[in-house]
């Protein structure tokens, strides 16, 4: 049922009449309304005069158009919002429908001032809404998060792909590689927008599609550029293209120039055999992130065969968009059973995919095992790149010599093909952009699911294990592997050399033909180390552990070897390597992340015994974020570290323990480990979550450090943290006192939590005194000072079983046979305390201090503490303790 048309009339400034006339077509196309400029109110109206405007259309559309017109005529806010340049395709791609939907949804006027910069103007509410949307887009783009449900994720990818291909332009490929969460947000923005303001006027709809760039305003004048200039800019942009479009054009040129050349599939089948098994191969296709974006590119064997069949029905002509539409139609015809693949198949396909890019199988399996096969392929690619770089750097350090044969291989002219695609002449950003799209294109190669040691098209970082006498046979094969140094990955990436100049060679990950090919290991593939006496079968086992890939000519030699014999006495390192996983490298260096994950494999259980604690200890306030990040080596938020710290103070007798952690840390995050400890501590009432919430994708979180200081101030407790709270020193006097005297620092040695014996330095109190409540000692001071020659700070004061307590609080001398774990807190001993009440009853009441003595003590204290802040405190102490005559005891009270 069509919406009832309404008529609305309102006024606008007369000087905006020209702007409204120029923007009429764009406003009508955006909101599906008819706009009429009626004229001025009258000559008697004082300047500036206003003119009448009339809107006709659906009620909601008229309301939105009215808000938009008010915003461009009398804007309340004018803001500029930045975004990553890689997100430029969102605002100009898909015929600018996303930008139009954003304007329709917020009623704010958006114009692209430059790549990475948007101009926003309109009413205050509209500008705030538009900025919130854009900031949320940026957040989703930078986080690259997956959707919680894999089925929902595939549906979002399919719908977004169909939507983008229906409005295809030069930015289609860039839109298809956006993160899935951002795709879902864009679909939500555009869903129903086309039908919301639909009026049935075909001309209006056609104008919305054809005049996509007319609404782009000039940043200097605020007016729309003319249609002729827009057309010229559009043609210039089509000619210039993007890194993705340039790569696609080069691929089209290569394939169109050599139509008879087909890429040999990895499974080694002929084209006829491949056509017969086409259905079986389709069932093995994995609909991953890369697959959903654009399947069956031009250099896929399946696509070449389908292009011959569909030549009469559709004209492909190297058009990427037509190819994408064929792929989407083909994927829709597949049944749900065919689309679903097992986890093992997905894992094998993902491993083979990264192997074709030139990475070793060990590194790929290691990274996938850590992050999981459901992670975004781009994130996996980044981690594999980092791991490969670390591995190659470590291997370069172990390489002893450089062999002169590298100069021979350099001059063999392997990269002399005119059709090869290199990135030497492109800038760095273009290289990175091209690499992402090369990932998408290589994902379409028809590789088999079964993992093999090495196949014809498999590009793996390998050691050369070919004997010298067999080298000429290998160089005579149809595809040769040359070990070259990759300047971007700092690693070895074998390059494929084709005997025919017509074939295309793809340089792996931006490798250059000018880079010297330096084999980091000798020709026999063994490390430059003194070897023990081993049989040949043990050597081959070592080579397999190193990830070697031997040539087909060396396979018969391996098959004739005898079965391996156990040699625990001769080679313990080999037996250890066998017990390790297949992804472990014997010569790879250990990283902090690896060591941390190894410690997580050791089980730990938080056990707090149900027994009474001590009442003389201060409240313990733990900075949970600081403790967790420290235990996680500044890379992970380790909840185990918080549990270890709580258990440490619980064993000391503390029962008043509070841990503060931001609430957003309880969400699912791969960098937050063992979150069940947070749940356990929260159930015990030890964990307190500081408030945090999400508003339009932006996190609004309270500062947890303020909660720490507030609680320590109210309870007189100690804050366990390594933070110095420098920004809160001047907040208040009480907070400064907490930061100065009540911060307990710590350290972790693996899973061992350690605190210092002297938290305030060598001249400060010991740990047991630091942890005790101050009220216990303060109540004793008047009584002890009244006793003859007995005082807390008197050198003659002795506690049985301990040393004399001096003002310097020097630690007691360690005994020769004492254990080395001196960092553990010592239990305080006060055997004199029970005898104090009876002692007080037998002694006469001491005489009160005279006014002269009070003045002398006050002057002496003012000389010691000249600050004006402490003068008031000195007067309060002297009034509160009229019997106290000991200057040392009074000084201690001032310091407290």
From Swiss-Prot:
Keywords: Cytoplasm, Hydrolase, Immunity, Innate immunity, Nuclease, Nucleus, Phosphoprotein, RNA-binding, Ubl conjugation. Its EC number is 3.1.-.-. Proteolytic cleavage by CASP8 or MALT1 leads to its inactivation. Residues 59-143 form the KH-like domain. One of its GO terms (biological process) is innate immune response. Transmembrane segments: none annotated. GO terms for cellular component: cytosol; nucleolus; nucleus; PML body. Changing residue 623 to N: Abolished ability to degrade HIV-1 mRNAs. Residues 849-896 are annotated as: CoCUN. It is found in: Cytoplasm, Cytosol; Nucleus; Nucleus, Nucleolus; Nucleus, PML body. Residues 414-430, 803-813 have a biased composition (Polar residues). One of its GO terms (molecular function) is ubiquitin binding. Pfam families: KH_N4BP1_1st, KH_N4BP1_2nd, RNase_Zc3h12a, UBA_N4BP1, UBA_N4BP1_C. Induction: Up-regulated in response to interferon alpha (IFN-alpha) stimulation (at protein level). The modification Phosphothreonine is found at residue 242. Changing residue 866 to A: Abolished ability to interact with ubiquitin. PANTHER family: N4BP1-RELATED, NEDD4-BINDING PROTEIN 1. The CoCUN region mediates binding to ubiquitin. Does not interact with NEDD8. Interacts with NEDD4. Interacts with ITCH (via WW domain 2). This is NEDD4-binding protein 1. It comes from Homo sapiens (Human). The lineage of its organism: Eukaryota, Metazoa, Chordata, Craniata, Vertebrata. The gene is N4BP1.
């Amino acid at each position: 049922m069509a919406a009832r048309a309404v008529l609305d009339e309102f006024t606008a400034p007369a000087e905006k009449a020209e702007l409204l006339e120029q923007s009429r077509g764009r406003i009508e196309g955006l909101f599906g309304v008819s706009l009429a400029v009626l004229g001025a109110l009258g000559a008697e109206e004082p300047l500036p005069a206003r003119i009448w405007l009339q809107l006709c259309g659906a009620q909601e559309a008229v309301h939105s158009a009215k808000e938009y017109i008010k915003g461009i005529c009398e804007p309340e806010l004018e803001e500029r919002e930045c975004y990553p340049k890689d997100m430029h395709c969102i605002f100009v791609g898909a015929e600018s429908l996303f930008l139009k939907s954003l304007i329709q949804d917020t009623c704010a006027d958006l114009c692209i001032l430059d790549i990475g910069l948007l101009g926003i103007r309109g009413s205050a509410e509209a500008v705030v809404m538009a900025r919130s949307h854009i900031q949320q887009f940026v957040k989703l783009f930078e986080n690259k998060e997956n959707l919680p449900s894999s089925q929902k994720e595939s549906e979002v990818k399919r719908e977004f792909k169909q939507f983008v291909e229906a409005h295809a332009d030069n930015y289609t490929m860039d839109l298809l590689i956006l993160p899935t969460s951002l795709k879902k947000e864009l679909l939500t923005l555009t869903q129903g927008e086309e039908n919301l303001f639909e009026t049935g006027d075909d001309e209006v709809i056609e104008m919305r599609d054809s005049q996509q760039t007319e609404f782009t305003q000039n940043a200097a004048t605020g007016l729309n550029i003319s249609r002729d200039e827009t057309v010229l800019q559009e043609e210039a942009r089509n000619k210039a293209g993007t890194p993705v479009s340039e790569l696609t054009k080069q691929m089209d040129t290569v394939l169109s120039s050599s139509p008879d050349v087909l890429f040999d599939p990895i499974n080694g089948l002929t084209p006829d055999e491949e056509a017969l098994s086409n259905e079986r191969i389709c069932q093995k296709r994995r609909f991953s992130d890369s697959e959903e974006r654009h399947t069956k590119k031009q250099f896929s064997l399946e696509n070449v065969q389908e292009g011959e069949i569909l030549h009469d029905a559709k004209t492909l002509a190297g058009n990427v968009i037509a190819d994408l539409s064929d792929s989407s139609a083909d994927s829709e015809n597949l049944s749900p059973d065919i689309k679903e693949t097992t986890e093992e198949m997905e894992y094998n396909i993902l491993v083979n995919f990264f192997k074709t890019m030139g990475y070793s199988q060990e590194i790929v399996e290691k990274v996938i095992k850590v992050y999981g096969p459901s992670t975004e392929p781009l994130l996996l690619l980044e981690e594999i790149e980092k791991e490969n770089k670390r591995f190659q750097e470590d291997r370069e350090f172990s390489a002893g010599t450089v062999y002169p044969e590298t100069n021979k291989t350099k001059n063999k002219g392997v990269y002399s093909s005119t059709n090869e695609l290199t990135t030497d002449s492109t800038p760095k950003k273009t290289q990175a952009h091209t690499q992402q799209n090369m990932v998408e294109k290589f994902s379409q190669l028809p590789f088999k699911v079964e993992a093999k040691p090495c196949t014809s098209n498999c590009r793996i970082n390998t050691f050369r294990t070919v004997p010298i006498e067999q080298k000429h046979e290998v160089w005579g094969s149809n595809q040769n592997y040359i070990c070259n140094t990759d300047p971007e990955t700092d690693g070895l990436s074998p390059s494929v050399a084709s005997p025919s100049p017509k074939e295309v060679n793809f340089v792996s990950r931006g490798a250059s033909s000018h880079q010297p090919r330096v084999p980091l290991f000798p020709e026999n593939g063994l490390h430059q180390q003194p070897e023990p006496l081993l049989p040949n079968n043990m050597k081959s086992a070592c080579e397999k552990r190193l990830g070697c890939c031997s040539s087909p000519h060396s396979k018969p030699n391996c098959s004739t070897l005898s079965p391996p014999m156990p040699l625990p006495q001769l080679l313990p390192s080999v037996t250890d390597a066998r017990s390790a996983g297949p992804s472990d490298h014997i010569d790879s260096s250990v990283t902090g992340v690896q060591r941390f994950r190894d410690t997580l494999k050791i089980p730990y259980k938080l056990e707090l015994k149900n027994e009474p604690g001590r009442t003389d200890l201060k409240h313990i306030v733990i900075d949970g974020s600081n403790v967790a990040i420290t235990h996680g080596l500044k890379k992970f938020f380790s909840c185990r570290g918080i549990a270890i710290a709580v258990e440490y103070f619980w064993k000391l007798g503390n029962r008043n323990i509070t841990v503060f952690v931001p609430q957003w840390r309880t969400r699912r995050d791969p960098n937050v480990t063992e979150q069940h400890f947070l749940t356990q501590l929260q159930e015990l009432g030890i964990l307190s979550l500081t408030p945090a919430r999400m508003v339009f994708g932006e996190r609004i979180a309270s500062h947890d450090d303020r909660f720490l200081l507030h609680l320590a101030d109210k309870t007189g407790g100690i804050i366990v943290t390594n933070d110095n709270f420098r920004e809160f020193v001047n907040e208040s006097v009480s907070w400064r006192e907490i930061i100065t005297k009540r911060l307990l620092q710590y350290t972790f040695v693996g899973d061992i939590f350690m605190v210092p014996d002297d938290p305030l330095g060598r001249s400060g109190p010991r740990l047991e005194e630091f942890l005790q409540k101050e009220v216990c000692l303060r109540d004793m001071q008047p009584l002890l000072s009244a006793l003859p020659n007995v005082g807390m700070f008197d050198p003659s004061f002795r506690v049985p079983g301990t040393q004399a307590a001096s003002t310097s609080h020097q630690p007691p001398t360690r005994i020769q046979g004492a254990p080395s774990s001196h960092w553990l807190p010592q239990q305080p001993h006060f055997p004199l305390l029970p005898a104090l009440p009876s002692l007080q009853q037998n002694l006469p009441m001491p005489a009160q201090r005279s006014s002269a003595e009070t003045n002398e003590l006050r002057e002496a204290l003012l000389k010691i503490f000249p600050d004006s802040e402490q003068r008031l405190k000195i007067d309060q102490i002297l009034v509160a303790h009229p019997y106290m005559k000991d200057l040392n005891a009074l000084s201690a009270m001032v310091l407290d």
